[in-house]
Amino acid sequence: MTEPTVARPDIDPVLKMLLDTFPVTFTAADGVEVARARLRQLKTPPELLPELRIEERTVGYDGLTDIPVRVYWPPVVRDNLPVVVYYHGGGWSLGGLDTHDPVARAHAVGAQAIVVSVDYRLAPEHPYPAGIDDSWAALRWVGENAAELGGDPSRIAVAGDSAGGNISAVMAQLARDVGGPPLVFQLLWYPTTMADLSLPSFTENADAPILDRDVIDAFLAWYVPGLDISDHTMLPTTLAPGNADLSGLPPAFIGTAEHDPLRDDGACYAELLTAAGVSVELSNEPTMVHGYVNFALVVPAAAEATGRGLAALKRALHA
């Protein structure tokens, strides 16, 4: 007798209504500038943003200079605050300090921490590994200058969404391997870590909102032009961190979305971390789509999902 199919939950109705009203989809044929413009259309009403002390800086390390960052201080400022280095999403090709300003603010408030949001160089103008190089230089700068910001250099975490989750995972490995600042936590929102496009969620959610398979292919073509990714196990660990030795990495929270092509990628990375002895919490959000952290201020279910990751980050930083 055939087992009955268990229907998965639908997309949260408030989120679905928002996506239907303000579609942000694009195709590879549209090109990167159209994609960037569509992402910039997602704006949070200013009155919903928490008022924080914010400072623009240009940082650098070891020959890499002129990396823009935006520093956020939490509502209650005290000495030796923990520091979160945040890497925005957007397929390594879109986004920046402004598109992810609400997200950075949420991390400063939710984690009660200083947040340094990094404006790394984007593809296709600057393909891999330019963004990784900038991100690493910014993390090294934070490690050496945390005290000047009022931060505690012994309590630094990385966080990022989507491509920024990929970068955060890479940064955690580099910090372990290349003598970077010791990290206490990694918060990975719907990251891409495996580059294994054969995972079931890439087919199951091939036409999902926000991020579909066509968009994924465009991002990869812009970020790693001409690279054969058919054998994901042969990719460098700074592109596919799931290929690395994962032992000795900091604890992690991985947030995934049921209606997201990257869902199984995050789940696989969580399994690999666990097998390597790393403490990891995986939270798959059954009614969410890719990018839900960006909707936390306007969609209650997205706020609840985001809150789970921020709570884990806060616990790790204030243990």
Swiss-Prot record:
Annotated family: Belongs to the 'GDXG' lipolytic enzyme family.
Record-given protein name: Carboxylesterase NlhH
N-acetylthreonine modifications at: T2
Keyword entries, A-Z: Acetylation, Hydrolase, Serine esterase
Active site: S162, D260, H290
Chain ranges for the short sequence motif Involved in the stabilization of the negatively charged intermediate by the formation of the oxyanion hole as given in the UniProt record: 88-90
Transmembrane parts of this sequence: none
Catalytic reaction list: a carboxylic ester + H2O = an alcohol + a carboxylate + H(+); a propanoate ester + H2O = an aliphatic alcohol + propanoate + H(+); 1,2,3-tripropanoylglycerol + H2O = dipropanoylglycerol + propanoate + H(+); a butanoate ester + H2O = an aliphatic alcohol + butanoate + H(+)
GO molecular function: acetylesterase activity; carboxylesterase activity; short-chain carboxylesterase activity
Temperature effects on activity: Optimum temperature is 45 degrees Celsius.
Pfam families for this protein: Abhydrolase_3
pH-dependence annotation: Optimum pH is 7.0-8.0.
Function: Hydrolyzes various short-chain esters, such as triacylglycerols and vinyl esters. Has no activity against emulsified substrates.
Tagged with keyword Iron: no
Annotated GO biological process: catabolic process
Signal peptide annotation: none
InterPro entries from the UniProt entry: AB_hydrolase_3 (IPR013094), AB_hydrolase_fold (IPR029058), GDXG_lipolytic_enzyme (IPR050300)
Annotated organism of origin: Mycobacterium tuberculosis (strain ATCC 25618 / H37Rv)
